[in-house]
A protein has these predicted regions:
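Short, glycine-/small-residue-rich phosphate/pyrophosphate-handling segment
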Residues: 111-161
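N-terminal beta1-alpha1-beta2 submodule of the flavodoxin-like/Rossmannoid cofactor-binding fold
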Residues: 1-108, 167, 173-176, 180-216
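Conserved anion/nucleotide-ligand pocket segment
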Residues: 162-166
């Protein structure tokens, strides 16, 4: 089994990067036959800007550019996709959001039938989300941030494409908590990555066929 671990943080010495490494270690420890790839979006200088060229891809007027096609191929090779990211303003960083905007394109991640019904094309994909935040859990619950992130990311992005979000973790108090606690959690997630993925029932919830990109 193969995991693609996508990390979005500019500092290679960050806790976010360390957690990604621990997830990878857990994947290897679970079964020597498992494999993983860490996609460091900052190190590879992925351009997150959604340009006119990307809009042409969305309209099916042009094929995906080389950098987008390469990321799609990475995901196609994976049995599980793991996103590891710091939480900026109660959501994912622009680098990761732009990666999703460009890579999860019309025709590859989703499509529309002749009668404008949504066709979810990533039903085979199992997704694990690991957000790293500085605030405590009470803050996320009291203000509704945790639910808002699930609505936007778990449901709004991945369910729209048919992908099953198997686990969605918030590792909080990142600047106060003993890093070992979060590292142990990340390693355990890696160990169980493919076990829990098998339990995913991907019926999804309904979206209508409305285009998720505004053309105005």
């Amino acid at each position: 089994m193969h995991a693609l671990i996508v990390v979005a943080h500019h500092d290679p010495q960050s806790l976010t990067h360390s957690l990604a490494s621990q997830i990878a270690e857990g994947v290897s420890l679970a079964d020597p036959g498992n494999s993983f790839e860490i996609a460091d979006l900052s190190a590879q200088a992925f351009d997150p800007r959604f340009t006119a060229a990307d809009l042409a891809v969305h309209h099916r007027e042009e094929p995906p550019p080389a950098d987008v096609a390469a990321e799609q191929a990475r995901i196609d090779r994976a049995d599980a996709l793991v996103l590891v990211y710091p939480i900026y303003w109660w959501s994912m960083p622009a680098l990761l959001k732009g990666w999703i905007d460009r890579v999860f394109a019309n025709g590859w991640a989703f499509d529309y039938s002749s009668d404008a019904k949504l066709v979810k094309k990533l039903r085979h994909l199992r997704v694990h989300l690991v957000g790293v935040g500085g605030a405590d859990g009470r803050t996320y619950e009291r203000h509704g941030y945790a639910d808002a992130m699930k609505t936007q990311i778990d449901h709004g992005i991945f369910d729209y494409c048919g992908a099953c979000v198997v686990t969605s973790e918030l590792l909080l108090e990142s600047e106060m908590q003993d890093p070992k606690v979060h590292m142990d959690t990340a390693r355990a997630l890696g160990r169980e990555l493919f076990t829990v993925s098998k339990r995913c029932s991907n019926n999804g919830t309904s979206h209508n066929g409305t285009d998720l990109f505004s053309m105005t």
